[in-house]
């Protein structure tokens, strides 16, 4: 029997938006895999605290979703991929196969200016000319999130 597949979305999204509405979850289930979906704190159906301290350990919420009876195969995108990478380092016995997508150079080199630009966009403080920064607020709102909880 194959290990369950844990699917973790990226920043501003949700399990529903990234994995269910795109058909990925259904394809895995059709292939006989059990799917475990998790919404990261501040996203989708997860609690959305406004206290930054609550977000210190996103990986703990993912660990709480894992079954007790063996490892999972895991797929993560962007923030979900970074969270799974941390999970694999902390508890390698809990992870079988690991697919990490959408992280690029961010895994090794944080783009502080880019992060501040996104935060300004989400808070509505970016210059009107910075369409990309403003798009981040719209993107975060589309998944039913509380954008203020995400920054």
Map each language-model feature to its residues.
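Hydrophobic, aromatic-rich cap/lid helix
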Residues: 137-151
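The serine-hydrolase catalytic nucleophile loop
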Residues: 12-25
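Alpha/beta-hydrolase active-site loop signature
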Residues: 12, 40-44, 105
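Flexible "cap/lid" loop of the alpha/beta hydrolase fold
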Residues: 85-90, 95-126
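Gly/Ala-rich beta-loop-alpha elbow adjacent to hydrolase catalytic centers
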Residues: 76-84
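Active-site loop/oxyanion-hole signature of alpha/beta-hydrolase fold enzymes
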Residues: 20, 30, 34-73
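The conserved beta1-alpha1 loop
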Residues: 6-10
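Short beta-strand immediately N-terminal to the catalytic nucleophile in serine-hydrolase-like folds
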Residues: 74-76, 101
């Amino acid at each position: 029997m194959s290990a369950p597949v844990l699917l973790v979305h990226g920043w501003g999204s949700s399990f529903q938006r990234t994995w269910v509405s795109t058909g990925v979850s259904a394809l895995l289930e059709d292939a006989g895999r059990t799917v475990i979906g998790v919404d990261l704190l501040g996203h989708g159906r997860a609690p959305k605290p406004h206290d930054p301290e609550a977000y210190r350990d996103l990986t703990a919420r993912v660990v709480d979703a894992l079954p007790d009876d063996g490892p999972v195969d895991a797929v993560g995108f962007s923030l979900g991929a970074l969270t799974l990478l941390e999970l694999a380092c902390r508890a390698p016995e809990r992870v079988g196969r690991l697919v990490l997508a959408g992280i690029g150079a961010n895994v090794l080199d944080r783009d502080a200016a880019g992060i501040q630009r996104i935060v300004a966009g989400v808070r509505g403080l970016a210059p009107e000319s910075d369409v990309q920064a403003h798009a981040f607020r719209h993107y975060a709102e589309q998944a039913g999130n509380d954008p203020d909880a995400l920054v």
